Amino acid sequence: MARICLHAYVGGRVQGVGFRQATREEADRLELDGWVRNLDDGRVEVVWEGEEDRAKALERWLGRGPRHAEVSAVEVEQMPLQGIAGFVVRR
């Protein structure tokens, strides 16, 4: 299956609830590469790439997030592959 790269902004109660760490763990489970970070406006930004079915699985997961999160919006767009290796939480 082809690799794709996706970029998302996740809104709602997504900071201070373990969202970034949980996203990294889910991405690792799905064998995806990329990064996640908090934004000053309260959203979380995520860029990830991997096999299309796995990448789409993370997109679906972002719509729910971890247990204590309350996701109200997810904006996702496809972008060119970035050649990212590993998945990290950016500060």
Swiss-Prot record:
Reaction catalyzed: an acyl phosphate + H2O = a carboxylate + phosphate + H(+)
Domain of life: Bacteria
Catalytic EC class: hydrolase
EC numbers on record: 3.6.1.7
InterPro entries in UniProt: Acylphosphatase (IPR020456), Acylphosphatase-like_dom (IPR001792), Acylphosphatase-like_dom_sf (IPR036046), Acylphosphatase_CS (IPR017968)
Leader peptide range in chain numbering: none
Ranges where the Acylphosphatase-like domain occurs: 5-91
Pfam families: Acylphosphatase
Catalytic residues identified in the record: 20, 38
GO molecular function: acylphosphatase activity
Keyword terms: Hydrolase
Disulfide bonds: none
Family statement: Belongs to the acylphosphatase family.
Protein name as catalogued: Acylphosphatase
Organism: Pseudomonas aeruginosa (strain ATCC 15692 / DSM 22644 / CIP 104116 / JCM 14847 / LMG 12228 / 1C / PRS 101 / PAO1)
Gene name in the database record: acyP
